[in-house]
Amino acid sequence: MINKDIYQALQQLIPNEKIKVDEPLKRYTYTKTGGNADFYITPTKNVEVQAVVKYAYQNEIPVTYLGNGSNIIIREGGIRGIVISLLSLDHIEVSDDAIIAGSGAAIIDVSRVARDYALTGLEFACGIPGSIGGAVYMNAGAYGGEVKDCIDYALCVNEQGSLVKLTTKELELDYRNSIIQKEHLVVLEAAFTLAPGKMTEIQAKMDDLTERRESKQPLEYPSCGSVFQRPPGHFAGKLIQDSNLQGHRIGGVEVSTKHAGFMVNVDNGTATDYENLIHYVQKTVKEKFGIELNREVRIIGEHPKES
């Protein structure tokens, strides 16, 4: 049952066209799975995010944030409370050797803007399918580069709706981790300090990384990206491959035969299929090698109700 009081309160804080009720979230995830959100809002201004977060905090209403849904699994039971999509906070500005980008801007697009201005440092991100907010949240990286290498600061909002500006040091960026996760903050925008370079060399590096990515990753299927973090001294994909799990399927989801670190939706798979396959892979690798595989992908939402 959707709470009409919450709906009416949201209408006072944000234009009605930015509010959706009982919205299917599978429309917004790379896996094409997920239940409905009680309220799904799409703010276009930082102050709108702040206002909604402050209202939710004061009224003890849970808030969930979504970027472009590339490294997340949403259960079929959906998400209660308010889901805030940050995708419309997608501005990208260039000033000298710095780029400021909104949380919803695709990090791929930001890397391309950097190239167009002959700025080097974001080439590693040319194939990462996440948003700026998600990239900072998990210190995204690929092919030897990571957000930590070039970020200057992040402007965030806390659980009370107040703005917090964090420097690189204050962000405590580590392998797939940050203070943002620990303090339950959300990124509104981030600034990156880059270096002058040659556009032809930057493009050549991006072309090389794109070719490597396309040749190794199962981009032809819906997926949640890299499922597991890299265990110290090992590669998750190699452990899964050596456990003979490539091609193993539960429901409509299988361990990719192209890259064992990915799970792909090959036949109308569900979030439950993903979650069950993840647990099975973790259990199998643990039994065979004694190594715990920790998830890189986030799993959120409620389990579906049993019929």
UniProtKB/Swiss-Prot annotation:
Under the heading SUPFAM superfamilies, the entry gives: FAD-binding/transporter-associated domain-like, Uridine diphospho-N-Acetylenolpyruvylglucosamine reductase, MurB, C-terminal domain
Q: Which cofactor does it need?
A: FAD
Pathway listed: Cell wall biogenesis; peptidoglycan biosynthesis
The record's InterPro entries line, in alphabetical order, gives: FAD-bd_PCMH, FAD-bd_PCMH-like_sf, FAD-bd_PCMH_sub1, FAD-bd_PCMH_sub2, MurB, MurB_C, MurB_C_sf, Oxid_FAD_bind_N
Q: What catalytic activity is recorded?
A: UDP-N-acetyl-alpha-D-muramate + NADP(+) = UDP-N-acetyl-3-O-(1-carboxyvinyl)-alpha-D-glucosamine + NADPH + H(+)
Keyword field: Cell cycle, Cell division, Cell shape, Cell wall biogenesis/degradation, Cytoplasm, FAD, Flavoprotein, NADP, Oxidoreductase, Peptidoglycan synthesis
Q: Which GO biological process categories is it annotated with?
A: cell division; cell wall organization; peptidoglycan biosynthetic process; regulation of cell shape
Q: Which terms in the Gene Ontology molecular function aspect does this entry carry? A: FAD binding; UDP-N-acetylmuramate dehydrogenase activity
Name the residues annotated as catalytic in the UniProt entry: 176, 226 (proton donor), 296
Coarse class of the primary localization is cytoplasm
Q: Where in the cell is it found?
A: Cytoplasm
Alphabetical list of Gene3D superfamilies matching this protein: 3.30.465.10, UDP-N-acetylenolpyruvoylglucosamine reductase, C-terminal domain (3.90.78.10), Uridine Diphospho-n-acetylenolpyruvylglucosamine Reductase, domain 2 (3.30.43.10)
What EC number(s) does this enzyme carry? 1.3.1.98
- Residue ranges annotated for the FAD-binding PCMH-type domain, each copy included: 33-197
Annotated Gene Ontology cellular component terms:
cytosol
A Pfam family that this protein carries is: MurB_C
* Top-level division of the source organism's lineage: Bacteria
Protein family (similarity comment): Belongs to the MurB family.
Role this protein plays? Cell wall formation.
Record-given protein name: UDP-N-acetylenolpyruvoylglucosamine reductase
